[in-house]
Amino acid sequence: VAHGTDSDNTFALSSTGLVLDSRVNITRTGLTTLTLDGLAGDDTFTIGSDHGYATVNVDGGSPSNTDVATITADGLNPVTVTLGTSPVSTTDATVANTGIGTVTLSGVEVANVVAGTQNVTVNGSGEDDDLTYQPTGAEAGTVTKAGLGVVTNLSGVGDLTIDGIGGDDTLTVVGTTAVDAFTVTATSVVHASLQDANTISNVDALSVSGGESADTFGVTAGAIPIFIDGGDAIGAGDAITIAADVNSATFNTGPETDEGSFAIGGAAGLVSFDHVESLTVVGTSVAGNAATVNGNSADNDITLTATGTDDFTVGIDGQTVTFTDFNS
């Protein structure tokens, strides 16, 4: 065990040993587990690969502000981040990789995980996890869990997998203040220029929030409900394009002109939305492409306008839905 002090301490672990506050060099001899105890203060932990320990326990202690751990994987093998339970957990998260072994984090508010262009899996827990992922760069993103004190910043990511593991889990993918273009399914959220959530599994509900600017969402319905929040309307506003393929589409208007939902064919999950100004549903001009439009409890004013062969728009109380390649 390497103890810090009640002041701010800096721990640096690498293949050459452990350095504490740039002055104490501790060399490993026949040990498999190392504990770094920051005690009080705002401590910094830097952990590199090939340090020789199977397990490194990082305890940030009681911070006056923030304890930060930066963990750099070997750049050769995948990385797995497992989030702890909330609100009380002896372990906030673990980070595992062949080159670093298993790093457990307790009392650490910020975990920076550098994957070296390798694939990263972020696992939830067996409880009901409320997860949020925000892409921040071409190979970077941030994952948080409601009720858990650690913010996990990922960089150098190859493919990203987010797995809820167990419980009734939700995932929210958050865009930026700039223009975002998302391709959304029940099992992935792809961003046009930032790090994707390439694989999503064991999640019971998915939300995608565009934030500010005029964002676009290409959506395919699936086994779980998908909610799209366009955010504040800028310019032409936010747009959803629903891929119906060979299926029917039922549109349910909402209480406001920028909200409602779609049921697509036999997909179990509704696609619902709010703060979205442009709505398009695309079929394939087959017999199964039948459109149904449902009003709400108000006195609805519905207008059907043909725009081409198998193409038409339906206006309902100021809200317009464009159906393309729908034959009825």
Residue ranges of predicted features:
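Acidic, glycine-rich low-complexity segments
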Residues: 1-328
